[in-house]
Amino acid sequence: ILNEVFITHNDSGGEPSLYFFNLDGEIINSKKLEEESFWEIYNNDWEDITADEDYIYIADTGNNFGNRGNLNIIKVKTNDFSIEGKINFTYKDQEEFFYWIPKTKHKYDAEALFLIEDKIAILSKDRSNLFTDLYLIDKESNSKQVLESKITYDVNSLITGGDYNEELSLLALVSYNSKGSQYLILFENFKLENLAEKKFKKIKIPIERAQIEAIKIIDNKTFWITSEDEGIGNPYMYKLKVK
């Protein structure tokens, strides 16, 4: 959310564009990210989006088959939506890229992106064991970064989106399992200094035939969540309240 307007994007494919919509779900504007001479911007597999006062950060981090060597986060200026740059990264312990035989059960896919303190954080979507690994990225560095897992959480599901509220010290994630059940996962008192506290709440979301991919914290009991159109239902935005 930027200036009371929701900002979203397509998943993989299509134009590298941002879409702006209101509370009624009406698209009120769109902005194609210009391909500048130095930065080639593509929607390889955009998965999540977050922002601070100066920049929007777009996670081009989708890696279903573990064969991407061009994972990156795109930095977009909030004042004019011009491209500031890209933060390229790779995973330290990934030795195989499965170019010839795509592999679906691996931990080098990531769909959740959020800001915490002065870092960008991403959480893996691990089909091999249904855990999630937390990685931290220096948002000021322009050099390629090699990421190493800071901690692993046994969420027993596949993480598809995340948001962090620093005032509430609350991390909110959405996920699903192989049966199609959707979950809200809440880490309270979540800070970089206490990542080892692995306590979280996992709440089943009573929505069927939807692929929930994004979440925004309103307060510690209320959240916006959105689903995408993947052939199993229409895209929707829901306001979710928990007790």
Residue ranges and their predicted role:
Residues 1-243:
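Sequence/structural signature of beta-propeller domains
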